[in-house]
Amino acid sequence: MEIGNLKLENPYILAPMAGVTDLPFRLLCKEQGAGLLCMEMISAKALQYKNKNTKVLLAIHPQEYPVSLQLFGSDPKIISEQAKRIEDLPFQILDINMGCPVPKVVKNGEGSALMKNPKLVFEIVSQLVKAIEKPVTVKIRKGFDDDHINAVEIAKIAEEAGASAVAVHGRTREQYYSGEADWDIIRQVKEAV
C-alpha cells in the first residue's frame, strides 16, 4: 500500500484517536505490526499560540516510523502555516481531521463540521498540499447527519485538491461512535477515488 511517496509494509493503519493514540500506545501498536501509526489530533490554533500542552502531543519516537500527524482546524491559512512550521518533525504524513464529532470542536467549524462545507474542504487541502512536501490525507465521516450523507462528494473534493488518501469513518457525526458503521459508504468512497 502506498500513500503519496510512502510505501507501507502492510495495510494495517492505526486510527487517530484523541486520548488513546499517545506515544506509548503507538509504540505498542508498532510492536504488534501496525503498518502506519497515527498521532492524536492536534489543534492548528494551539500550535499557532505555542500551547505548552500541545508540545507533548508532538513527541515522536524514532521506532514509530512511519507515523502520521493529524491536525484539526477550519482556517486554511493557519493550518498551512502551522504545518509548514512543524514539517521538519519526523512524521511522514500530515492528516486533516474532518471527522471529530465532539461539540467543542464542531462548534468552531472544525472536525466533522467541515463535512458541511465542501468549498472549505477544498481550500484547506489545496493550500496544505502547496505549503508542505509531505503527503496530505484526510479523515472524514459518512456525513454530518442522515440528511447530509456526502462522504463520496467530500472524498472527491479532497482528491481533486491533492489529498494522497482518504480515510472514512462509516458513521455520521450525529451517530458519534454508536450504531452500526455503514460499510457500503466506505466501498462507495473507495470506488470513487
Name each region found by the language model.
Residues 1-193:
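Flavin-dependent oxidoreductase catalytic cores
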